[in-house]
Regions:
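Acidic, mature catalytic/reactive cores of soluble proteins
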Residues: 1-193
Length: 193
């Protein structure tokens, strides 16, 4: 959008990226990643010949949907009338056909706030994020919920057992050269995001 504001030739590209945002939001929210019981997004493992398996391990991956937030200011719509018209058509089409539409809030006609996460799910994700026995630590946000310290995640896939446990220091296994980065420590780059 920023480029399109300065060069109208990119208006079609901005529209395409907006449509892709909507389709990604639909995939995240409508295709088995959200768990209503745990109120969290999980990875979904698809194995040929089997039903998709939701990997109910609370990792920072389930929080990354919070990163995709954007505000579209009224002045952008004013400078890009075709973009505004296409977005309006796309929204009407999806709503008319009962298709997913991402969390969108408008403030007095001035700006549009877009988020991959619907408001009601956002509240639950923030509860996980800000809970000291889950993701929040003195040093930042953990990569794996501290919940898994006493409750390791176990899954059996094709007869092989796998376990993931909160392990924020030196790894207790030799996998990946003893690297435990996915098992609880704080990663500054992700905390910055």
């Amino acid at each position: 959008l920023e480029i399109a504001v300065h060069d109208i030739a990119f208006e079609d590209t901005a529209t395409k990226f907006f449509e892709q945002f909507v389709l990604i939001a639909e995939a995240i929210n409508e295709h088995g990643l959200w768990n209503d019981e745990d109120k969290f997004f999980y990875d979904l493992l698809s194995i040929s010949g089997s039903e998709p398996l939701q990997l109910r391990m609370q990792s920072i991956v389930g929080l990354t949907s919070l990163f995709a937030v954007s505000t579209i200011e009224k002045k952008v719509f004013d400078k890009l009338p075709d973009f505004k018209k296409r977005i309006s058509w796309f929204e009407n089409y999806r709503r008319k056909n009962q298709k997913f539409w991402p969390n969108e809030e408008k403030s007095d006609g001035e700006a549009m706030l877009l988020s991959l996460v619907p408001r009601e799910r956002l509240v639950f994700l923030l509860e996980h994020l800000l809970h000291e026995e889950k993701f929040l630590s003195d040093g930042g946000i953990r990569t794996l919920s501290k919940y898994h310290e006493k409750n390791p995640y176990h899954v059996t896939i094709n007869g092989v057992n796998y376990t993931a446990q909160y392990d924020p220091g030196d790894s207790t296994s030799d996998f990946y050269g003893g690297n435990s980065n996915w098992r609880g420590p704080v990663w500054m780059p992700l905390n910055y995001l």
